[in-house]
Amino acid sequence: MLASASRERPGYTAGVAAPDLLDPKSAAQNSKPRLSFSAKPTVLASRVESDSAINVMKWKTVSTIFLVVVLYLIIGATVFKALEQPQEISQRTTIVIQKQNFIAQHACVNSTELDELIQQIVTAINAGIIPLGNNSNQVSHWDLGSSFFFAGTVITTIGFGNISPRTEGGKIFCIIYALLGIPLFGFLLAGVGDQLGTIFGKGIAKVEDTFIKWNVSQTKIRIISTIIFILFGCVLFVALPAVIFKHIEGWSALDAIYFVVITLTTIGFGDYVAGGSDIEYLDFYKPVVWFWILVGLAYFAAVLSMIGDWLRVISKKTKEEVGEFRAHAAEWTANVTAEFKETRRRLSVEIYDKFQRATSVKRKLSAELAGNHNQELTPCRRTLSVNHLTSEREVLPPLLKAESIYLNGLTPHCAAEDIAVIENMK
């Protein structure tokens, strides 16, 4: 069966192991699909499987990431609660005591009137009006410069929240304006990010050329150039603007850095907003701040894109290593299977040949003994005849040892006397 199976397989050659699927010479003679002709083997897969493996994240991975994010949120909530809740309780207690002291000192004002005044103040603050001083100290939040800055926060999706449309017409226009402006700003941000990436890329290339002259490894060069790129961007778009805001807005260094990071990451809490106080040249100051936001966002987008490229490269290398391992495992399995099949085929052929030889010897012995049954048989020949007749339905196992043939039922002494008979019949 094995021999027939080997003849049915096209291109099968007895005694030859499976062709090396990674060897170009042997692969050139084999028309069947192979792993690869390159030095780095890859695993064959259909286009659908490869696309799904590349573009679709597995549910197990999604679930793991989801659990990590939830755990991260729980940790953040715990830390923020521990840091901020005592301050909130202190502020609530302080305002209650101040209200009681104010009512005690001003008997003409009752608690209801005071609450109404406080509610109006809260409403004014929510509308972007700070009820301090007189009208001469008030700054409009809807002049041309402030409106330009607000429109910029809409399309950049920062949304500080210090001011917002209060009229129905303003809300409707803001919806339409955001839906059209956000994609437009996305194209602009991508273009500016590409230009910044090109500029920084040229600078990084010069730095790498300098380090190459010093015989530094490529990995160290890449790490050093990346660190220089990030540090230069942080100085240009974070540290320097923070110093400017600290000087112009009168904030502390921590508040200035806090505003810069919260703004450029498009979080935009709105607790700190540039241009919120009475500043000279305010109409020009806010548009300049918006252009800084544009370039800073482009820089952060370039950094995030670079990090994404790193992750893709790492993922690609990991997949290549796994694919190479699988290819070698498949090659090893194929070779072992081929060798096992070849060994089994050879054993089958040898056993079959020996069986045929034993059958032929048995037939010749039967014919010889049948022709000489009237002759006088020696005790050894009589033993051979009896054993042959009783074992006619069994296979006569040939035993080859020291180039001498011993038949079942013969002692070495008898075999020595009749060995010539067997040799003549072979």
From Swiss-Prot:
Effect of I158C: No effect on voltage-dependent channel gating
Result, substituting T265C: No effect on voltage-dependent channel gating
Residue span of region Interaction with AKAP5: 313-326
Outcome of mutating T266C: Loss of voltage-dependent channel gating
Membrane topology type: Multi-pass membrane protein
Top-level taxon in the UniProt lineage: Eukaryota
GO biological process assignments: cardiac ventricle development; cellular response to arachidonate; cellular response to hypoxia; chemical synaptic transmission, postsynaptic; chloride transmembrane transport; cochlea development; detection of mechanical stimulus involved in sensory perception of touch; G protein-coupled receptor signaling pathway
Spans within the Cytoplasmic topological domain: 1-61, 193-222, 309-426
Annotated phenotype, changing I163C: No effect on voltage-dependent channel gating
Main location per the UniProt record: other
Annotated site (pH sensor): H141
Keywords, comma-separated and alphabetical: Cell membrane, Cell projection, Disulfide bond, Endoplasmic reticulum, Glycoprotein, Ion channel, Ion transport, Membrane, Metal-binding, Neurotransmitter transport, Phosphoprotein, Postsynaptic cell membrane, Potassium, Synapse, Transmembrane, Transmembrane helix, Transport
Activity regulation description: Activated by various stimuli including intracellular acidic pH, mechanical stretch and polyunsaturated fatty acids such as arachidonic acid.
Region (Important for GNG4 binding and L-glutamate release in astrocytes): 17-38, 51-61
Entries under InterPro entries matching the protein: 2pore_dom_K_chnl, 2pore_dom_K_chnl_TREK, K_chnl_dom
SUPFAM superfamilies linked to this entry: Voltage-gated potassium channels (SSF81324)
Compartments in which it is found: Cell projection, Axon; Cell projection, Dendrite; Postsynaptic density membrane; Cell membrane, Sarcolemma
Gene Ontology CC: apical plasma membrane; astrocyte projection; axon; axon terminus; calyx of Held; cell surface; dendrite; endoplasmic reticulum
Tissue/organ expression: Expressed in cardiomyocytes (at protein level). Expressed in various brain regions including the lateral olfactory tract, piriform cortex of the forebrain, paraventricular and anteromedial thalamic nuclei, brainstem, caudate putamen, nucleus accumbens, neocortex and interpeduncular nucleus. Detected in astrocytes in hippocampus stratum radiatum.
Record-listed K(+) 1 binding positions: T157, I158, T266, I267
Intramembrane region residues: 144-170, 253-283
Binding sites annotated in the UniProt record for K(+) 2: I158, G159, I267, G268
Role description: K(+) channel that conducts voltage-dependent outward rectifying currents upon membrane depolarization. Voltage sensing is coupled to K(+) electrochemical gradient in an 'ion flux gating' mode where outward but not inward ion flow opens the gate. Converts to voltage-independent 'leak' conductance mode upon stimulation by various stimuli including mechanical membrane stretch, acidic pH, heat and lipids. Reversibly converts between a voltage-insensitive K(+) 'leak' channel and a voltage-dependent outward rectifying K(+) channel in a phosphorylation-dependent manner.
Written domain comment of the UniProt record: The pore-forming domains 1 and 2 assemble to form a single pore in which M2 and M4 transmembrane helices line the central cavity and M1 and M3 face the lipid bilayer. The transmembrane helices are bridged by the selectivity filters 1 and 2 carrying a signature sequence TxTTxGYGD that coordinate the permeant ions. Up to four ions can simultaneously occupy the selectivity filter and at least two elementary charges must translocate across the filter to convert it into the open conformation.
Subunit structure comment from the entry: Homodimer; disulfide-linked. Forms heterodimers with other 2-pore domain K(+) channel subunits, such as KCNK1, KCNK4, KCNK10 and KCNK18. Interacts with AKAP5; the channel is recruited to postsynaptic microdomains by AKAP5 where it can integrate neurotransmitter receptor signals. Part of a complex composed of AKAP5 and ADRB2. Upon AKAP5 binding, the channel is no longer sensitive to intracellular acidification, membrane stretch or arachidonic acid stimuli. Interacts with POPDC1; the interaction enhances KCNK2 surface expression and is inhibited by cAMP.
The name this protein goes by in its record: Potassium channel subfamily K member 2
Organism lineage: Eukaryota, Metazoa, Chordata, Craniata, Vertebrata
